[in-house]
Amino acid sequence: MKKYIVICFLFLSFYSKASFVLLPMEAEGQKNHLKAYGITYWALEKQYKVSWLLNFRGGSFLLPDTDEVRKECQIRGVTFEVFSDSKMNAILEEISSPSQNMETVVLEKAPKIAVYTPKGKQPWDDAVTMVLTYAEIPYTEIYDEEVLSDQLILYDWLHLHHEDFTGQYGKFFGAYRNAPWYIEQKRDAENLAKRLGYNKVSEEKLAVASKIRDYVIGGGFMFAMCSATDSFDIALTAEGIDICEPMFDGDESDANYQALIDYRNSFAFKDFNLERNPMVYEFSDIDTTNDRQKGIIKMEQDYFSLMDFSAKWDPIPTMLCQNHTQLVKGFMGQTTAFASDKIKSSVLLLGENKINGEARYIHGTKGKGMFTFYGGHDPEDYQHRVGDAPTVLDLHPNSPGYRLILNNVLFPAARKKKLKT
């Protein structure tokens, strides 16, 4: 009987001292930062209580200590540490101290994720689908039919990537107008627009952009990268205006369309000038890609700094900036970064390069919802070109640039707190 009591005591003592699993997220403490987000999402799906410890050891995640959680971490190669109640309570008390720029944010549910992408695209065709697949975070692919039939309300989070909402087919005409893939994509877009009841691709894409705008205003979260950022705003500001040259839509553009642009309709950008030349691979002067092509910004100098926010007063931008480094290497895309003087004052700069006069990572609110724009195509492929092989994320499990994407994936799971900035 005494032996039985001792065994029970030891068993209970062990679990009283080991009731939390911490996924450390600092630079040296985590073998696979990206898959740690996948573990956190998985735990939310399992309805475990999960917390995000902002600014604590790189933005660590706190989960309950169960055999299932430990096993899943081991299977996915994610570093974890086990803490007793007393030790974790001391840490949480330290985090809550007014003198510490840290905060505990409760994650309530696994957000339903939609990725806006044409049918038949592979996961490596954009950085978000690639990292979601790698992190084992489930998502649903949707495209114009689903958006126009009001299916966005089924999702908490929407991602847009290598898209052109202006109807100019990515401005690839100058370099690729005779390429089979360009001809096929143009034909497919025209057929889709006709099937959905539109005379032009530009009109159909504006309708899609308007539905997405309404989704955000109604409380949705939108995350856009690469050309989906500026082309989205351009489409909204050019509503009712023909900005497409004949090779794109079969008729002349409005002669004075620049003067007709209504910047009030945009989410993030102001006072931009559109690129009228169809041979130029650029939408407007929002984008700063040309500074790299001209050699003004060299690859070895291409970095951006993440801003520092008050975790207790500004938990939203703090969540979006969680990382194990404050300096993140840059990467090019069709839209690489945003000229600082073209960004509205109501928009928060999350990551910028002041010397270059550009922001890479920005965030704002629209109605009841929020949006985040992130310039560039692939955080681990500096100059991704058409036809390049996909990035192998097993070689970049600790990528700071990809972490920023995954911050946005988990962000809608957080218990809502009012932004005070």
Which residue ranges define each predicted feature?
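Hydrophobic targeting/anchoring helices
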Residues: 18-126, 135, 376
